[in-house]
Amino acid sequence: MPPMTKAEGKQDKKAQQYGVTPQSVDFNDWYNEVVKKADLADNSPVAGAMVVKPYGTALWENIQRWLDDRFKATGHESLIFPTLIPMNFITKEADHVEGFAPELFTVDRIGTEQLTEPYVLRPTSETIIGYMWSGWLNSYRDLPFLHYQWGSVFRAELRTKAFLRTSEFYWHEGHTAHASEEEARREVRQILDLYHEFCRDILALPVVRGEKTASERFAGAVATYSIEGMMRDGKALQSGTSHYLGQNFSKAFDVKFQTREQREEYAYTTSWAISSRIIGAIIMTHGDDFGLIMPPRIAPIQVVVIPVSRKENFDQMVAEGEKLAHELRAQGLRVKVDRREGVTNGFKYNDWELKGVPVRIELGPRDLEQGVVVVKNRNAEEKETLPREEAIRGMANRLDSIHNWLLQRATDFLLTHTVPADSYEELKNAIEHGNWVRAFHCGNAECEAQIKEDTKATTRNIPLDDAEFFNEREEGVCVKCGQPSAYGKRVIFGRQY
């Protein structure tokens, strides 16, 4: 991973007191410990599957709520499809079955009775949705279909990592059908831009919007677009995808309609998704050596109030803490009062730091007498003593400032650790030092595969012309073979999760 800054390095010794391995010592251990000790998730007795605990579930529910509201606001409708999909559906689209075959969970018996037609646990739902659409669609008047569902999907993973790679994971999957290619492609971009907005404005995650190379496309897609985020170890995380499927699935499942001109035509379809992997992105983009730092706009708890007192007046201080919390909740904030007894204040401070709650307020008897509170931002070293009313009045702005700080820090890291390369040696050296690389590429799949074999890096995407980062158009020759660039701009290479 890229070297830590001097300021971050100074935290290592102090961080050990919290029981979290510093990122600079072992990023993988740091991640696993934070997931467990921050009470986000735990291992389960089912190989490759996790249990998402209440704190992690609350985070996922906030993610669902924001996205669900936006989907509905843009005319999309939710529905529910079966988890079991007939195996013969998967085999109908050749590229689709080839892409998913190694990952399928198969159900071939009920009790001791062998099934004549096996099922699979859904890896994604394009096939069964296409089958149902074929019975629902008759005329252009029925279009567009703007559908999505929330649920879990199943893809066998040998090397699992909580939230990032599990054999069962959680997501929404959107599926739409349109009367024209233009309309379908517009849908693909609308969703990609919505994902970008969500990451930037809600999660404080800077992401690169771009199109995947042919080798990295979704199985059966004509074009795949992604948002790519850089984690604190320099690896990429594909944080969301939007696919233009053309007529591939509609032809496989006979999804056709009568046009205005009374012709029969196959529908143009799309699919798109953000999964629970986005929680991994939050952890690995914003976390530090003391644990999580929750983006304030999505945090399950935005402010924690800690009554500070001796045992004899603890109940009184808890009551005062609840009054303070009530005033903050009146602003629409998510607030918790730590009512735990028999636990030291120091333990509580460390615990909420680990959980990444954006703002901590300490309230003791002397503070109460003086009409002040002690406030500490999760991203700050020092505490502030403020008049009670001032702290309450300024809380929304304080949370916004933390969001902006997180976004700027992550953006600076992305820009610092993304470098151009004009020779193969430069590319290999930059990748080895934990960077993303911007380089020209010929578009040849064999050339791309050789780069992956040599460096363990893949093409992340080809940034769009209106992408926030790295969108410059320029010509050059492939960094590997010297042939002319296929894309008129540099492609992003990086190791990935």
Curated annotation (Swiss-Prot):
Domain of life according to the entry: Bacteria
Could you tell me which Pfam families the record lists for this protein? Answer: HGTP_anticodon, ProRS-C_1, tRNA-synt_2b
In the record, biological process GO terms are: prolyl-tRNA aminoacylation
Quote the cellular component terms of the Gene Ontology held in the record.
aminoacyl-tRNA synthetase multienzyme complex; cytoplasm
Which InterPro entries is this protein grouped with? aa-tRNA-synt_IIb, aa-tRNA-synth_II, aa-tRNA-synth_II/BPL/LPL, Anticodon-bd, Anticodon-bd_dom_sf, Pro-tRNA-ligase_IIa, Pro-tRNA-ligase_IIa_arc-type, Pro-tRNA_ligase_II_C
Q: Give the primary localization class.
A: cytoplasm
A GO MF term: ATP binding
Q: Which PROSITE patterns match?
A: AA_TRNA_LIGASE_II
Can you state which reaction this protein catalyses?
A: tRNA(Pro) + L-proline + ATP = L-prolyl-tRNA(Pro) + AMP + diphosphate
Gene3D superfamilies recorded: Anticodon-binding domain, Bira Bifunctional Protein, Domain 2, C-terminal domain of ProRS
Please tell me whether the keyword DNA-binding is annotated for this protein: no
Transmembrane helix among the record's keywords? no
Tell me the SUPFAM superfamilies matching this sequence.
Answer: C-terminal domain of ProRS, Class II aaRS ABD-related, Class II aaRS and biotin synthetases
Localization per Swiss-Prot or TrEMBL: Cytoplasm
Q: What is its EC number?
A: 6.1.1.15
User: Which key words are in the record?
Assistant: Aminoacyl-tRNA synthetase, ATP-binding, Cytoplasm, Ligase, Nucleotide-binding, Protein biosynthesis
User: What family is this protein classified in?
Assistant: Belongs to the class-II aminoacyl-tRNA synthetase family. ProS type 3 subfamily.
The free-text function statement in the UniProt record for this protein reads: Catalyzes the attachment of proline to tRNA(Pro) in a two-step reaction: proline is first activated by ATP to form Pro-AMP and then transferred to the acceptor end of tRNA(Pro).
* Description of its domains: Consists of three domains: the N-terminal catalytic domain, the anticodon-binding domain and the C-terminal extension.
**Quaternary context:** Homodimer.
Name this protein carries in UniProt: Proline--tRNA ligase
